[in-house]
């Protein structure tokens, strides 16, 4: 998802008066603007995906706290917010696809350690997989 795509969605959310989408997009656009200032230039698409993932993680944590505090109003609000944020992310790889990708990387690079496999996986499929699952699968394949 590019910055211009996000801004177009933001404009559409303003026009349709969709408060949750607007709130989520404003948070992401603000994070992108801060990163742009930090980088002193445009933010690459890979970094935008990472920023959206951070927002998703933050929203999940807030949702967990709301559930622990039994705050029904906040739970509903953050579930909607989380759904909007997750819709901005690229499609996640299934466990089978991830397994195939790791096998291909091991075959191509001949890697025997976890580090090189995870590095190659990150370069090729950044933001499209769960790191814990990938790490567990890679360990399993390398020790087998």
Spans of features found by a protein language model:
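Charged, compositionally biased, marginally structured helical/coil segments
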Residues: 1-144
């Amino acid at each position: 998802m590019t910055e211009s795509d996000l801004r177009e969605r933001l404009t559409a959310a303003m026009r349709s008066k969709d408060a949750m989408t607007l709130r989520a997009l404003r948070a992401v656009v603000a994070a992108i603007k801060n990163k742009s200032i930090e980088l002193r230039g445009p933010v690459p698409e890979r970094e935008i995906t990472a920023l959206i993932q951070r927002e998703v993680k933050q929203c999940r944590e807030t949702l967990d706290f709301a559930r622990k505090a039994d705050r029904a109003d906040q739970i509903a609000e953050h579930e909607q917010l989380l759904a909007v944020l997750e819709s901005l992310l690229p499609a996640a790889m299934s466990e089978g696809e991830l397994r195939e990708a790791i096998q291909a990387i091991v075959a191509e690079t001949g890697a025997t350690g976890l580090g090189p496999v995870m590095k190659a996986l990150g370069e090729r499929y950044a933001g499209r997989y769960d790191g814990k699952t990938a790490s567990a699968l890679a360990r399993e394949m390398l020790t087998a």
